[in-house]
Amino acid sequence: VLLKSLQEYAARAQPAAHVEEAGGWWLRHSPGDAWWVSAVLPHDREDRVTLAEEFCAERGSGVRFQITPGVCADDLDARLDGRGYARGHDMSLRIASTSEVLRQVHADAGEVTARPTDEWLTAWQSVTTRDVSAERDLLSRVEHPSAYAYAEVDGQVVAVGRAVAEQGWAGVFGMATLPQARGQGAARSVLAALASWAAAREANHMYLQMEKANSTAFRLYERTGFREVCSYHYRIRT
């Protein structure tokens, strides 16, 4: 139940422009946003693959399934493999107690705002190279309490991240550090700010999703108390 809840909290923290629920399956379409925002969440044991494929075909988009072991039907991954879906993007879902993050982060907290500032978005865009106007739209759809944290060096925003609180959990998203500021504690400062905000909102646990190949992120989160609760991946057909 925890894994399903966390993946759904994460989906609500990165809300697609269009979502249809079919039983426990979330069919999502969000042109202009990061590809994973449109991934299907197949969160019950029914076979709704054809329905999901039709949903995506009607909207002219590729089909992507987020495969979380223990949440999806046990044979879904193999069935998608048999239908020609490629496996990609090995991911790690990690959790920590908020108090542990605050203990381990060893950094002065950065600043927090309730909405993304232009400076926050500029720093985010320069690292991710994604479309700012699409991201503004996505962030405006988030319904749960949110925090936007940033760290500055000489008056310039050099690292950003955001958190969304739901049901006692704060999810961490959008962590980005400018290349010249990496390895200097800026990301830790952002994480400290988000953890402080989470604690003040009585979100006593934190979670995040990260690509397993991201060794820099792995080191940061390993050292700040986040431990893996599951691996998951995507099945993709374009």
Regions found by a protein language model. Name each.
Residues 59-69, 198-209:
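Conserved GNAT acetyl-CoA-binding A-motif
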Residues 86-97, 207-209, 218, 222, ...:
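Conserved catalytic-core motifs of GNAT/GCN5-like acyltransferases
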Residues 132, 136-178:
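A conserved beta-strand-loop-helix scaffold within acyl/acetyltransferase catalytic domains
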Residues 1-58, 72-73, 132-133:
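N-terminal charged segments
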Residues 1-7, 39-43, 91-93, 98-140, ...:
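Short amphipathic alpha-helix that is part of the acyltransferase structural core
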Residues 47-53, 174-179, 183-196, 200, ...:
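Conserved acetyl-CoA-binding loop-helix of GNAT-fold acetyltransferases
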Residues 45-119, 235-236:
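Acyl-donor-binding surface of acyltransferase catalytic domains
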Residues 66-74, 179, 208-218, 235-238:
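Conserved beta-strand-loop-alpha-helix junction that forms the acyl-donor binding cleft
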